């Protein structure tokens, strides 16, 4: 059965009113989109920005009275008129549609990320079989790829790891397959913790090798490697905590950061971490370094 989309173009200032009106007028879902190709990569702390030209898209059932719904949306938003368009959305198996576009990715020599529904291109390689589910982390995003590429070049034999903001578990599972002895995962999203556990099982790894926790329950024992692919704001705030999770000489890998945010990250971590490399892919970067030796009380 097809669906109907009502698309209303508006300004940043009016967008919340139109969004509220759409939600109160029987829409099954409401989405806000950029209407002028002005990307917002990450809001500043405490902000929830919108695009100056914003498109509000409401999803309605196919038998919707379009005239009546438009009038109701305008009335509830307090507008006399609005630039709008009704669009027919053909019904599809969206999960299958998405699956056709997700292909194996090589992240290093002999190291592949493969969707669980495809055969690995190189059966003899280290193949991480992944079903992302509802959490982030498929290997396609530049930040995930940069972290995986770094892991592929490290000696992980018998290393202990924390995957902070584990999402689908892709980084931690990659570390285990590349030789790490154990990974501790943490995330604020329960769906992410579930996806991680499912992907651990999918890769035939023992559940005890990758326990997962909410951040307030995560063990604080220092480890050899900390991976954190989240956002710049949280990474800056978490600098003392993430540094404290590293043994002296332990390795840190940070991503989820735009090149324009590099200086803020470096300033936050340089007191405790010797920054070694900054990798870049498109506009995103990955920062790696080594935990400095702890200062003695006499120092």
Swiss-Prot record:
CDD domains assigned: AdoMet_MTases
Residues binding S-adenosyl-L-methionine, per UniProt: 144, 165, 187, 229
Record-level GO cellular component terms: cytosol
GO molecular function term, any single one: protein-lysine N-methyltransferase activity
Cellular localisation: Cytoplasm
EC code(s) of this entry: 2.1.1.-
Biological process per Gene Ontology, one example term: methylation
Key words of the record: Cytoplasm, Methyltransferase, S-adenosyl-L-methionine, Transferase
Catalytic activity reported: L-lysyl-[protein] + 3 S-adenosyl-L-methionine = N(6),N(6),N(6)-trimethyl-L-lysyl-[protein] + 3 S-adenosyl-L-homocysteine + 3 H(+)
Source domain of life: Bacteria
Protein family (similarity comment): Belongs to the methyltransferase superfamily. PrmA family.
Function description: Methylates ribosomal protein L11.
Protein name, entry field: Ribosomal protein L11 methyltransferase
Annotated gene: prmA
């Amino acid at each position: 059965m097809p669906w109907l989309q009502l698309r209303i173009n508006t300004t940043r200032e009016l967008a919340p009113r139109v969004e509220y009106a759409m939600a109160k007028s029987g829409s099954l879902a409401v989405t806000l989109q950029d209407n002028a190709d002005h990307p917002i990569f990450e809001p500043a702390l405490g902000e929830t920005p919108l695009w100056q030209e914003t498109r509000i898209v409401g999803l309605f059932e196919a038998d919707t009275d379009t005239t009546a719904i438009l009038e109701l949306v305008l009335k509830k938003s307090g507008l006399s008129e609005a630039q709008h368009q009704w669009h027919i959305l053909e019904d599809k198996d969206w999960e299958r549609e998405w699956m056709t576009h997700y292909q194996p990715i090589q992240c290093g020599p002999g190291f592949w990320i493969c969707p669980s529904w495809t055969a690995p291109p190189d059966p003899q390689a280290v193949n991480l079989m992944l079903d992302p589910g509802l959490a982030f982390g498929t290997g396609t995003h530049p930040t995930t790829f940069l972290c995986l590429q770094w892991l592929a070049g490290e000696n992980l034999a018998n290393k202990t790891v924390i995957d902070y903001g584990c999402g689908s578990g892709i980084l931690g599972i990659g570390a285990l397959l590349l030789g790490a002895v154990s990974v501790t995962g943490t995330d604020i999203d329960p769906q992410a913790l579930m996806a991680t556990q499912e992907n651990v099982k999918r890769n035939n790894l023992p559940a005890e090798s990758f326990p997962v926790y909410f951040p307030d329950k995560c063990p604080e024992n220092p480890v050899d490697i900390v991976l954190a692919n989240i956002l710049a704001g949280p990474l800056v705030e978490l600098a003392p905590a993430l540094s404290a999770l590293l043994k002296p000489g332990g390795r840190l890998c940070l991503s989820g950061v735009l090149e324009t945010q590099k200086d803020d990250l470096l300033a936050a971590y340089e007191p405790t971490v010797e920054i070694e490399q900054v990798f870049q892919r498109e506009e995103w970067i990955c920062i790696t370094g080594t935990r400095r030796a702890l200062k003695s009380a006499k120092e």
